[in-house]
C-alpha cells in the first residue's frame, strides 16, 4: 500500500501554485488540460538499496526489492501505481505542458514503457 501524504498547496501568485504531496492524489483534484509543468520524485522502489548503497544488487536487477517502510511495493504493484501517475499527468497537462520525473536508472525501461503508453513519446 502506498503511504498517504496530506496535500499542501502553496500559492506563488494569483495564477500559480505548487502542490506538495502524493502526486496521484494531488493530480486527481485538478481539471483536465490545466497544468503547464509537473515535477515529481516518486518512490524508486529500491528498498534497502537506498539505505545501504550497493547491497542487494542481484535482487534489485531481478525485480525483487527489499522493504524500507515507504518504498516496499512489489514490482507489479509499483508499476500499477506508476501507470496511475502517468495517466493523471497526461490528463492534466496542457498540450505543450512538460513533465519532469526523477527515477532510478534501474527503472528507466519501465518508465519509458509507461511514458509511451500514455503518449509522452
What are these language model-derived features?
Residues 1-121:
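S-adenosyl-L-methionine-dependent nucleic acid methyltransferase catalytic domains
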Amino acid at each position: 500500500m502506498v503511504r498517504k501524504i496530506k496535500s499542501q498547496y502553496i500559492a506563488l501568485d494569483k495564477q500559480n501554485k505548487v502542490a506538495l504531496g502524493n502526486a496521484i492524489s494531488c493530480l486527481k483534484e485538478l481539471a483536465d488540460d490545466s497544468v503547464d509543468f509537473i515535477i515529481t520524485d516518486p518512490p524508486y522502489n529500491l528498498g534497502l538499496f537506498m539505505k545501504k548503497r550497493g547491497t542487494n544488487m542481484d535482487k534489485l536487477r531481478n525485480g525483487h526489492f527489499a522493504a524500507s517502510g515507504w518504498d516496499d511495493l512489489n514490482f507489479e504493484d509499483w508499476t500499477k501505481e506508476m501507470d496511475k501517475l502517468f495517466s493523471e499527468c497526461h490528463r492534466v497537462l496542457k498540450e505543450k505542458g512538460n513533465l519532469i520525473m526523477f527515477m532510478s536508472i534501474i527503472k528507466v525501461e519501465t518508465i519509458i514503457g509507461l511514458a509511451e503508453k500514455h503518449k509522452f513519446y
